[in-house]
Amino acid sequence: MFVLNELPPQIPRELTELLVKAEPATIGHFLDYGFMDPEIRSLLPDKRIAGTAVTCRFSGVDGTIMHYALGQIRPGDILVVDRGGDRRHAACGGGVCFAARAAGALGIIIDGPATDIGEIREYGLPVWSRGLSAVTSKRLFTQGEFCVPVSCGGVTVTPGDAIVADENGILVLKKDQIEAVAKRAITMQQDEKPRLARVAKGERLPDINGTNAKIREIMAKK
């Protein structure tokens, strides 16, 4: 059975351009939720993307819906794939990644394996997956869901959510969270540079960030 829904509105470009400047690892200093399982890892180094989540879900071997998604996805979209717990069949390989890149997709995030790592590297489309598998999905035309709420890496992803992802992790945000979260992270990243400069000159980090002073205060109360 197929479930085919309409594409969601895209996140405005000014928000994704802001969000891509924010490192997920910086956001993780003040936000605990919305991060996918760290076992879903980037297959390409030094890549960060931020865009609109477009989702699909299929279980087992029938990956027909992946090919359907390639005809729907827009520039600036990130395809998020719920594999229903399947860890054996690769959801995408070189051909799908090449087609996704040609359609303008920013990347693919799979709660399951991918394949054709050499071609993925050659084509340069950022892909996150739970490793690799030589056993692939097939087009059997039996089932698949497009643009439905999915679970990926333990996080519910609704079509139209914002995604920011790099080799440190993947974060899902609602549109109304983007500006505040991104600006806070960017400020933290900017503040770190002068702090590291002080460390380079000989100061100790726990003196700069107040850790030593706070511990002395706590110990003095004993």
PLM region spans:
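Beta-strand-loop-alpha-helix segment that lines the small-molecule cofactor/substrate pocket
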Residues: 166
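Feature captures the catalytic cores and cofactor-binding loops of soluble hydro-lyases/lyases
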Residues: 1-159, 173-222
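C-terminal binding/interaction regions
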Residues: 163
